[in-house]
């Protein structure tokens, strides 16, 4: 019983400490009933850079890793021009191209989608910088 309470507290704390991006779109999320969760969001950070974020959490151990692919403002504008969409529509564009609402993905599938998004951004001719909290 005690282990379950700790698990639920850690899971709640982790979810409440989640960051927010401006115009954030949830691209894909793994099955919420699994002990390991993973998801991808896209949006704009506080510096108005376009960001795609992979969030990986092992709820049993409390391990959490976030990996950001950050596209600077100028490159994000070039990407929007290339895709013929407004800059503010980039998160929705990524959602439309890579979104998965089935909620049955496993973390490895989520990571594969993140790689596909990175490859797509390169194919649009933009550079990104990878950042991680680990």
Feature map (PLM): residue ranges:
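N-terminal amphipathic/basic-hydrophobic helices that include classical n-h-c signal peptides
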Residues: 1-20
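Intrinsically disordered, low-complexity segments enriched in polar/charged residues with Gly/Pro
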Residues: 13-14, 26-31, 107
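Charged, low-complexity, helix/coiled-coil-prone segments
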Residues: 14-15, 19-26, 56-62
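Amphipathic, interaction-prone secondary-structure segments
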Residues: 19-50
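A short, structured beta-strand/loop element
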Residues: 48-73
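Mixed-charge, Lys/Arg-enriched low-complexity segments
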Residues: 64-134
